């Protein structure tokens, strides 16, 4: 019997063939084990391949054991080619296998994969691969350790091995734990407050559920980009923080210095600010500048050292970390939605008027803290598919988590969400089927089109003209999800379109193509503003997946900034649209203003600095006001309709329009 530390030592070490063979012998007790690993032909991309033996499980499934040494590309970033090797496991000399446990060892690094490959038999079945990524750089690896301990306890069967590699179980476990933390965070006794209107003491828990979901979204994004070494671990290390924060009490319920000093400065003054522009806010008359550091009094180190603490983090842009506080200089009313403020004034009961309060214990409590929860799970920036899944929390699976949290914020589904343990989402295979069928239908449901989507597609040089025509048709599509929720459909559309484009044009760049598709082809609408933010979060993580590793010698550490998606994903009621007979919003006399508005939003998509975004948003507002004047001069538009259009601001992440117009809000006429 192996204990947890023995398993952890095995999984956290670099791969050793003899050590692995010993593990197979002790853990699985295979009935057929080669005395020496039997060399097998290595496919393209591998230096060596070995067949180690096979076993018959308690439920009569035959499972083979294989090892490949991977020579081309990092095993931690390369999966599609590995899955294509599985058909080679069917060899008359060994007999047929129902499944295989395969090690892919990267000879150029310490990383290695352990994959459970199912559905090998039969030419019509597309093999499924479920994978753990192991090695010294992969952290504590709590998930595989606990899963293999359970496998050892219940006994080795096909069903129990598949359970040990189950992504669905992982997601459900994570959601249940996160939901318990969410309920704790929103409980009034926990004491979390966000000021909202600073003049009203009674509203500082208004929409507290959405505020906590937004906090979770921002933190989970940070957790993902930690996988790319873009944020230092020291910002989440309790012991190191004791030397940074003044009077830091991590278990305290009456102190929120960590959220204010570390997380708010990370979100709003670091990830949302260019590296060269980072500084502390000092001018008392410029409280509206929400990209400057605050709370120097909460640190035990000087301001220069604080800037150095955050100095290795790139500027990401994108709006996810834009402070949502609204000031009277630009609006009729001031609202502290995020509560990022130097003003420490309090009401008579001690609650902040302008500043958010989140207790330290919510993050660091030994039993219930969020960081302990997150550290118990493995995260991956790789995007899973129905046929190829790493057993870790990936961006798509987190969509399921957020879909359930969003269901809790809806009064109609709140009680069901509390009891459901995570069922308010469309399963991935169904989403993928819907997306594929929609694209095939739009592109022309022919045998050639379907072949491009088939798992066994192979590029045919004689069809180059057809591929070019298909590429042109694909890039001309405008696709809208009118109730995008947490973004499952837009994410699947992005993945399918990218995969098809890569198949028919292997020369395209994945990162640039994703940006182009997001800018020109994919749109989303949802009545909940927080749902729109989650959709954008998932698209951002998808973009991060394709970034090159950081390069400290280059500006912004070699990391491109994220686009602004405010005019691509909007919060509105898609059920309320103009009457078909009135869809003349962009008639000839409005064309010039319309084109100017579209150009401003195109520029805003790529805008990087706070000043540039403000300039474009002010310009956008003027153009919208001009269009309203022109609309009032045209027949066919009611006063109510014009009023709704006039008050819609695409850059207000807290607001949802009671009206939806794809022409007005997205600048597009033809959608699928």
Residue ranges and their predicted role:
Residues 62-73, 639-648:
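Short, basic, glycine/proline-bearing loop/turn elements
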Residues 2-60, 70-91, 97-494, 498, ...:
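Preference for the N-terminal adenyl/adenosyl cofactor-binding alpha/beta module
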Residues 153, 227-233, 473-476, 480, ...:
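Class I S-adenosyl-L-methionine-dependent methyltransferase module
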């Amino acid at each position: 019997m192996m204990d947890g530390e023995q398993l952890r030592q095995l999984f956290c070490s670099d791969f050793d063939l003899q050590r692995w063979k010993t593990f197979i012998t002790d853990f699985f007790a295979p009935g057929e084990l080669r005395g020496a690993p039997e060399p097998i032909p290595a496919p393209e991309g591998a230096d060596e391949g070995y067949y180690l033996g096979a076993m018959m499980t308690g439920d009569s499934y035959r499972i083979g054991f294989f090892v490949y040494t991977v020579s081309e590309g990092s095993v931690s970033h390369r999966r599609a080619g590995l899955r294509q090797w599985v058909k080679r496991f069917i060899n008359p000399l060994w007999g047929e296998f129902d499944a295989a446990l395969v090690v892919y060892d990267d000879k150029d690094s310490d990383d290695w994969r352990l994959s459970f490959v199912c559905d090998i038999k039969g030419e019509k079945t597309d093999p499924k691969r479920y994978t753990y990524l192991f090695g010294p750089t992969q952290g504590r690896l709590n998930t595989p350790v606990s899963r293999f301990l359970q496998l050892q306890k219940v006994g080795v069967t096909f069903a129990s091995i598949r359970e040990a590699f189950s992504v669905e179980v992982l997601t459900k476990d994570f959601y249940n734990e996160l939901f318990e933390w969410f309920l704790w965070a929103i409980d009034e006794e926990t004491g979390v407050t966000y000021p909202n209107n600073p003049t009203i003491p009674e509203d500082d828990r208004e929409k507290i559920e959405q505020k906590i979901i937004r906090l979770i979204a921002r933190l989970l994004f940070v957790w993902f980009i930690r996988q790319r070494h873009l944020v230092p671990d020291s910002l989440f290390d309790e012991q190191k923080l004791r030397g940074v924060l003044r009077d830091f009490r991590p278990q305290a319920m009456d102190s929120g210095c960590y959220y204010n000093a570390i997380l708010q400065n990370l979100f709003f003054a670091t990830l949302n600010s260019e590296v060269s522009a980072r500084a502390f806010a000092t001018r008392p008359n410029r409280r509206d500048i929400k990209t400057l550091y605050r709370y120097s009094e909460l640190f035990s180190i000087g301001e220069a050292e604080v800037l150095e603490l955050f100095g290795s983090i790139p500027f990401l842009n994108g709006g996810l970390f834009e402070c949502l506080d609204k000031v009277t200089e630009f609006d009729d009313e001031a609202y502290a939605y995020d509560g990022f403020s130097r003003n420490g004034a309090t009401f008579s009961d001690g609650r902040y008027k302008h500043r958010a309060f989140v207790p330290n214990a919510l993050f660091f409590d030994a039993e219930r803290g969020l960081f302990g929860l997150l550290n118990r799970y493995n995260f991956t920036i790789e995007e899973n598919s129905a046929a190829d899944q790493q057993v870790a929390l990936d961006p798509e699976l987190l969509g399921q988590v957020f879909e359930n949290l969003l269901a809790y914020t809806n009064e109609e589904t709140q009680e069901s969400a509390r009891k459901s343990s995570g069922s308010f989402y469309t399963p991935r295979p169904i989403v993928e089927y819907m997306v594929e069928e929609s694209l095939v239908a739009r592109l022309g449901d022919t045998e050639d089109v379907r072949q491009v989507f088939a798992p066994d597609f192979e590029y045919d040089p004689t069809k180059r003209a057809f591929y070019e025509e298909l590429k042109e048709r694909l890039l001309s599509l405008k696709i809208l999800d009118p109730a995008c929720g947490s973004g499952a459909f837009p994410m699947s559309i992005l993945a399918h379109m990218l995969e098809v484009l890569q198949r028919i044009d292997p020369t395209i760049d994945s990162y640039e193509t994703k940006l182009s598709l997001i800018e020109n082809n994919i749109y989303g609408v949802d009545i909940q503003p927080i749902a729109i933010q989650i959709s954008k979060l998932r698209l951002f993580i998808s973009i991060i997946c394709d970034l090159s590793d950081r390069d400290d010698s280059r500006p912004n550490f070699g990391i491109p900034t994220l686009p602004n998606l405010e005019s691509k994903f909007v919060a509105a009621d898609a059920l309320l649209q103009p009457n078909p007979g009135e869809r003349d919003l962009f008639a000839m006399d409005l064309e010039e203003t319309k084109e100017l508005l579209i150009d401003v939003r195109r520029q805003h998509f790529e805008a990087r600095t706070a000043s540039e975004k403000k300039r474009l948003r002010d310009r956008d507002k003027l153009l919208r006001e001009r269009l309203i004047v022109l609309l009032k001069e045209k027949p066919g538009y009611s006063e109510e309709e014009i009023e709704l259009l006039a008050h819609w601001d695409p850059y207000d992440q807290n607001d949802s329009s009671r009206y939806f117009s794809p022409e007005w809000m997205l600048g597009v006429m033809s959608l699928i």
